[in-house]
């Protein structure tokens, strides 16, 4: 009888531990994915100057996790969902003198979350003057038709006024800037730092 009791207890213990084992396996898989990705990118990293460093604050870097960084490599959309991702991507775009793209995209996100009609009109004018109008300080690269459509909508701006322009800039970043970001020194050094020395193992 004592043998049966202890056998049953051990069985229960195994069942109780399974959720922990599943979570541990998921974390292990994430780590393997990140390790493999970084290994494939290390040749790019090692050809860069070792003396260079990013300007991100240490507090921002320390709170990131390998899981989150892996998400950034899946799509631009997943990168932009993360505030830290936005910050690092903006830093990269700034190094390429194209930070106006993400600034415009973020301004549009804020604009679409605005409920008050008067505030909407005010924000629409600010976005137009800063990013859309000819010779704007941070003029974005959109076609004439889209620019003209936004200009007409300013008379009675709606939530969708900048949708086409925002989509155009997102596609531009997705096809042009994002692939380079994933191979950039800014991203690779950050990712390697958060995964530790196991990347090279």
UniProtKB/Swiss-Prot annotation:
Q: Which InterPro entries match?
A: RGS, RGS_sf, RGS_subdom1/3, RGS_subdomain_2
Q: How does it sit in the membrane?
A: Peripheral membrane protein
UniProt-annotated location(s):
Cell membrane; Cytoplasm, Cytosol
Domain RGS as annotated: residue spans: 75-191
Its main subcellular localisation, reduced to a broad class, is membrane
Against Pfam families, the record matches this protein to:
RGS
| Record-level GO cellular component terms | cytosol; plasma membrane
Superkingdom of source: Eukaryota
Keywords from the named record:
Cell membrane, Cytoplasm, GTPase activation, Membrane
Q: Name one GO molecular function term.
A: GTPase activator activity
- The keyword Membrane is assigned to this record: yes
Cite the PANTHER family for this sequence.
Answer: REGULATOR OF G PROTEIN SIGNALING, REGULATOR OF G-PROTEIN SIGNALING 1
Q: What does this protein do?
A: Regulates G protein-coupled receptor signaling cascades, including signaling downstream of the N-formylpeptide chemoattractant receptors and leukotriene receptors. Inhibits B cell chemotaxis. Inhibits signal transduction by increasing the GTPase activity of G protein alpha subunits, thereby driving them into their inactive GDP-bound form.
Q: What is this protein called?
A: Regulator of G-protein signaling 1
Organism per entry = Xenopus tropicalis
